[in-house]
Amino acid sequence: MKNCMLGMSIFVLILLLGINTKHHAETVSGEAEIPSSILETMDEAIQKELIEDPKYIALTFDDGPRKETTELLLDGLLERGAAATFFVVGEQVYCNEALLLRMQAEGHQVGNHTYSHQRLLTAEKDTIIEEIQKNNVILQNILGKEEFWLRPPYGLIDASRATLIKTPMIYWTIDPEDWKLLDAERVTNTVVNQVSDGDIILLHDFYPTSVDAALEIIDRLQSQGYIFVTVEELFRIQGVTPKAGVLYAAPDKTRPLP
């Protein structure tokens, strides 16, 4: 616990000293863009396509934070100038508070994945409220924000229970089942072969193979002109204001609820 508090104190001190760690570039309009260092590595045809018709996608990570893997992932995102969204589990936050502060400082989005990864589709309504609010309070106390978009565990919730949710809910368009495959190459190929503009990709920052896959996905898709943004940025770029209690697979695609 002492080591946990020391790490937290050091990171807070860095923030108080005003060291700006936010990394993914923004245009005048507030939209994320590929850093110039990466843009320079692309051939002229891809650069031209990117300028005329930019392609935005969102990487999302569930079930963390986990110090050993999430830290490596954040390092890789920082190096590549890529933004991501982390749907965190409240039980995982203890002793990892500094990782959440780092996520926010470096321009990532933090979302709610419930306190203990309960299956909301079958949970009692009081349990659902407790699971979401308990995690919200933890995140609010650490990050100083009020609202955290929700990803229901397993992506499952029904219409009746969705009425309890006071924020947008985020699903995905591509699920390479990284948690099951535990194979970075297969996960990478699944995503790269399926991806298109506006996709939301599901991964987990809990497994080393998933971190390896995520960074390889970024490398390969950035070379094709894709820009990695947070889910919130993706909605803003596409001009969509998400509604509370609605499950979105993408800004222009909602999931029907049972």
Residue spans for each PLM region:
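Catalytic domains of cell-wall/extracellular-matrix polysaccharide-remodeling enzymes
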Residues: 72, 94, 118-227, 232-247
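Active-site beta->alpha N-cap acidic-glycine motif
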Residues: 30-123, 127-134, 138, 145-146
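Terminal accessory/targeting
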Residues: 1-58, 75-84, 196-258
